């Protein structure tokens, strides 16, 4: 059995998909279990190839009662905490970045200046398991009662310094609605007031606010069938990449070279005005604050044109189900 640790969020899971697929291909007859937060379960189902999810919210003791895994893979971080969490299970072999403090001395070195997708592909390649960094697509879920063809504006982010100002998001939403877009505003339950403020300032109807009304699987379905996504450096942007939905992503303080969409896909555009010196406190980071409404609207025009010109549609169904992969 293969146990993989990636106990993080939406964007973290999405950027780990190529590595997960590589492990599935390398060990087709083995059970593959993924350690991830329970609330990510609907999204884990869309990855394909994962037999079982082990629920864990971050690092710490893992309630594991089964036999020691034959192989444990740390796709979570550079250690030492994540290394020790897996080592405590006494796996037959541990694949991880080198971290002498945690007793891991045979792995590749960690590089801070590296795209998150490439980081885990490189680690597996070091151990002889090649991964395709472009293998980012997720299975496209049925939208059910969710609206299709909408423009998703997602103003939230975990850190307030990564949130573009409400008046600017509202100005973009107002302009796009005026151009004929059906705009919806998404977010977590804790971001409902933020989403409502954007919608109100943009003159959108109350039912345009979907923040807190969707779980992560429904959010994925909404993005999969959307016309456009406008958001910051968040998991929603990674969902847009996974479904080839046209997107404009606003970055800061982290550069898109570390977390952005593939640069060879012009229907996704990452805007970044950095580098700028980091500022303390919750204020919007200068690299993000430097982006104006005209910058975003111009990028919208470019990504929609690129999406319309795309000659070969991205496969709609995503990876085949597990039953056909083994």
Question: Where are the regions that the model predicts?
Answer:
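Catalytic machinery of carbohydrate-active enzymes
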Residues: 1-326
